[in-house]
């Protein structure tokens, strides 16, 4: 059961990253580089939350 929860969280995380990357790639043409950096920071923060959730399931 724990393994399936980790797999589900990993799939949700990859879906989140792919959605963020697609939105960034389409809007980065008109966006300034600092704004793109902030978006990357938000993606990294979401990655940390997803990893913390996966570790919480393992413990």
Curated annotation (Swiss-Prot):
GO biological process terms held by the UniProt record: plasma membrane organization
Signal peptide, first to last residue: 1-19
Keyword entries, A-Z: Signal, Stress response
Induction: By osmotic stress.
Coiled coil region boundaries: none
Cellular component aspect of the GO annotation: cell periphery; endoplasmic reticulum; fungal-type vacuole; plasma membrane
Family: To yeast DDR2.
Note: Present with 6140 molecules/cell in log phase SD medium.
Protein name: Protein HOR7
Annotated organism of origin: Saccharomyces cerevisiae (strain ATCC 204508 / S288c)
Encoding gene per record: HOR7
